[in-house]
A protein has these predicted regions:
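Short, glycine-/aromatic-enriched active-site segment of Class I SAM-dependent methyltransferases
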Residues: 150-173, 184
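Conserved Class I S-adenosyl-L-methionine
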Residues: 223-253
Length: 266
């Protein structure tokens, strides 16, 4: 199935008929998610054969990874069994034969060097022992494999003026991370940090703030958000080419070090 990012949600049996039609026409109806897709997916480019989406939620990133990397097998791991079941059914209906889902905890994954690429998007802020989770993701990668991790920044710009601590979202154990802090924790987990940057430029942050004012973390005011979403999406899209020196999200690309070469006998 091809189309706008997240259009696979139109196949979700747990959504209403209106929600399915809306997703078919406009893709995933979540402005923040669409911003993250635009910012994170380019960091996943490469000739990957096995990809892990750690903490995949409803599966939208997994679907996009499966389409972007048709040569790869994509596994989405999620703690909520209902989301796993629904994402699995969506992948089946969409014909994404290279995408599957399992129930799992990112702090307790039992994969040893299986994946070329691990993606973790807005997940670590939910995990109390985040360094342990990072070490688990390291073990899941083959030596030389790549991690693309995105998290909320500790602070965000409120509307167009000033900064304040990021949104207090239910389920978050911390508001977010500063880029140097996240990079240091990844190094503690024995990753080599390749690149670190902030995401969400001014226009993207502005529209994301408005989205949150309308719908909050509990997706309230769905009718109002359905009307506002196309405008918010269009405005945020104009900010896609910005390269913010500071923003409301943090994106880091890292790698698992190669195994040391053991010298042969003299």
């Amino acid at each position: 199935m091809r189309g706008l990012p997240g259009c696979e949600l139109s196949l979700d049996p747990g959504r209403s008929r209106f929600e399915r039609i809306y997703a078919r026409l406009l893709g995933a109806p979540a402005n923040g998610l669409r911003i993250r897709l635009r910012r994170v997916l380019p960091a996943t480019d490469g000739d990957h054969r096995a990809i892990l989406d750690a903490g995949c939620g409803p599966g939208v990133f997994s679907f996009e990874l499966a389409k972007r990397h048709p040569q790869a097998q994509v596994l989405g791991i999620e703690l909520e069994p209902d989301l796993v079941e629904r994402a699995s059914e969506i992948a089946r209906r969409a014909g994404l034969t290279n995408c599957r889902f399992e129930k799992g905890d990112v702090t307790q994954l039992d994969f040893d060097g299986k994946f070329d690429l691990v993606v973790s998007v807005d997940n670590l802020e939910h995990v109390e022992d985040d360094v342990t989770a990072m070490k688990t993701l390291l073990r899941a990668l083959r030596p030389g494999g790549t991690l693309a991790v995105h998290v909320p920044a500790y602070e965000r710009r409120w509307l167009l003026f000033g900064r304040r601590v990021n949104f207090d979202v239910p389920g978050h154990v911390r508001p977010g991370y500063r880029a140097p802090e996240l990079a240091e924790k990844l190094r503690l987990a024995e990753f080599d940090v390749i690149d670190q940057r902030y995401t969400y430029g001014p226009l993207e942050t502005f529209t994301n703030n408005l989205s949150y004012l309308i719908s909050g973390a509990d997706q309230r005011n769905k009718a109002l958000y359905a009307v506002a979403f196309p405008v918010l999406l269009a405005v945020s899209y104009l900010g896609k080419f910005s390269n913010p020196s500071w923003g409301a999200g943090v994106l880091i690309k890292a790698r698992r070090p190669d195994e040391p070469t053991v010298p042969g006998p003299a």
